[in-house]
């Protein structure tokens, strides 16, 4: 993966590992390019936690999944995340077979932080891009003397 994708995936894993708010987790996921039909922040955050967080009792409930998918659905899943997600599922499947509750983001947290630490300028650049997208372009405003 290119450094940009490494950092974005690391930010997603860390947002889940550090139990950030739905908005922060969903933003990290959206920054990778995921899009959903209704753009539901709650759905995107739940989906990220389901993929990379610890297995929770509701994850084993078909009704929970049904309700989640009635709320929203994935329209585009980023290709850069496909292999990461598949690896996550394989590790979780192995852990479940061994009767372990394996949290991918918890296990990969140190490596995710390492990816961020290796690219500090890129992290700043991505944050500036995110701020610009959130706040709109910066406009020089005239100042008037009193």
Mark where each language-model region is.
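Helix-rich C-lobe and terminal helical cap/extension of kinase-like folds
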Residues: 1-146
């Amino acid at each position: 993966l290119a450094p940009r994708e490494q950092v974005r995936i690391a930010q997603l894993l860390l947002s889940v590992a550090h139990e950030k708010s739905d908005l922060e987790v969903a933003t990290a996921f959206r920054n990778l390019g995921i899009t959903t039909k209704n753009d539901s922040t709650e759905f995107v955050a739940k989906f990220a936690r389901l993929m990379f967080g610890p297995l929770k009792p509701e994850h084993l409930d078909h009704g929970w999944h049904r309700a989640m998918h009635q709320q929203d659905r994935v329209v585009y899943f980023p290709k850069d995340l496909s292999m990461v997600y598949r690896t996550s599922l394989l590790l979780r499947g192995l852990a479940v077979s061994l009767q372990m509750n394996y949290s991918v983001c918890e296990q990969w947290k140190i490596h995710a932080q390492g990816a961020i630490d290796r690219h500090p300028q890129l992290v700043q650049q991505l944050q500036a891009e995110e701020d610009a997208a959130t706040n709109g372009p910066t406009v020089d405003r005239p100042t008037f003397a009193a």
